[in-house]
Amino acid sequence: MRKPVIAGNWKMHMTCAQAREYTAMFLPLIEATPNDRHVVIAPPFTAISSMAEAVGGTRLELSSQNVHWEDDGAYTAEVSPTMLLEHQVRYAIVGHSEPRKYFSESDEQINRRARSAQAHGLIPIVCVGESDEQRERGEAERVIRRQVEQGLEDTDPDKLVVAYEPIWAIGTGKTCEASEANRICGLIRGWVGASELIIQYGGSVKPGNIDELMAMSDIDGVLVGGASLDPESFARIANYQTS
């Protein structure tokens, strides 16, 4: 049975002090959250250590916002799997549309990151999705399938998460219709050929649309950006209801 993963990606937000304050407010709000789902936050690297101390022994799990494929070396600004494991990090986001856009990350690099994460016992959250231009040209499915096939090559689909994040819906206020998001997630499941693959939707997820999204048969969680920066908002998302 697929256990949903509700993950908040803080991106380049929150100092260590702000992260501690947030955590103190957030943890009581998820004390009664059902155990049929994972609740995850991906803080900036600088806040991971203090977050690890704050969430120890609670149900809140940590993710990194990236991970390198080497354990150490001359890779300025990168972070290795072994460094993350020191701080009780369980997940690692790879292939997010922002590194793809701003740093020209390739599917091959994303695949190396994902394989390295798995090799060290981390669960990669592999992001895929089309731009507005690709969607308008009718290329969305071809683009997403390429990202899935190349990004997941030689990985174990039972030990990763795929996040479908249409780029045109990230931080824009535009949301992919739940039925369309579900259709794409179903296609991804078919391309991978893994019925138990966890597939998230990401793109302007908020308290107002979480229940509809999570009622979809092929959506197994969400990757939340801006709405995860407010503890009450993210708690409402974590406490989604489908009935």
Swiss-Prot record:
PROSITE patterns in alphabetical order:
TIM_1, TIM_2
Which amino acid positions bind substrate, per UniProt?
N9, W10, K11, G171, S204, G225, G226
- Which reaction does this chain catalyze? D-glyceraldehyde 3-phosphate = dihydroxyacetone phosphate
Query: What general EC class does the enzyme of this chain belong to?
Result: isomerase
| Alphabetized UniProt keyword annotations | Cytoplasm, Gluconeogenesis, Glycolysis, Isomerase
How would you summarize the oligomeric state and partners of this protein? Homodimer.
- Name-wise, this protein is Triosephosphate isomerase
Q: What is the lineage of its organism?
A: Bacteria, Bacillati, Cyanobacteriota, Cyanophyceae, Synechococcales
